Amino acid sequence: MALRLEDKKAIVAEVNEAAKGALSAVVADSRGVTVGAMTVLRKAARANGVYVRVVRNTLAKRAVEGTAFECLAETFTGPTLIAFSNEHPGAAARLLKDFAKGNAKFEVKGAAFEGMFIPAVDIDRLAKLPTYDEALAQLMMTMKEASAGKFVRTLAALRDQKQEAA
């Protein structure tokens, strides 16, 4: 179905607005994926704060112009699904990576984070970023281990001091 110029401008504006507020973006090829599977993906995306849209390549290129995701323009070939993470930088990468495991025809093309292009083979770097709560927990564990280690070293020094005195 042909789109009117007004419709194209609306799509470009919508995707551009999503890109401006996003932390990261992932581009994928959704060719061969069933409608039911895409519906499941979109539902999961909404739950994770990820904006997902299938966009024509020329419209996608225009939408990302002047944003941090301009480096993705070379991946806009064939059917293009673009996902923007709004709440956590790794959310879209994690979502599409997990979706690709269950759908053999779904292929991640690449991602962008802070203006840097990340090829599909390195998508794990972005997908494995800890969430805010996970990062806080890791920091607390590190601090706890540091204080426990300091306590053990203090006890060992006290023991050594008593042995020398005896």
Swiss-Prot record:
Keywords: Ribonucleoprotein, Ribosomal protein, RNA-binding, rRNA-binding. One of its GO terms (biological process) is translation. InterPro entries: Ribosomal_uL10, Ribosomal_uL10-like_sf, Ribosomal_uL10_bac, Ribosomal_uL10_bac_type, Ribosomal_uL10_CS_bac. It holds the Pfam family Ribosomal_L10. One of its GO terms (molecular function) is structural constituent of ribosome. Disulfide bonds: none annotated. It comes from the Bacteria. Signal peptide: none annotated. One of its GO terms (cellular component) is large ribosomal subunit. Part of the ribosomal stalk of the 50S ribosomal subunit. The N-terminus interacts with L11 and the large rRNA to form the base of the stalk. The C-terminus forms an elongated spine to which L12 dimers bind in a sequential fashion forming a multimeric L10(L12)X complex. Forms part of the ribosomal stalk, playing a central role in the interaction of the ribosome with GTP-bound translation factors. Belongs to the universal ribosomal protein uL10 family. This is Large ribosomal subunit protein uL10. The gene is rplJ.
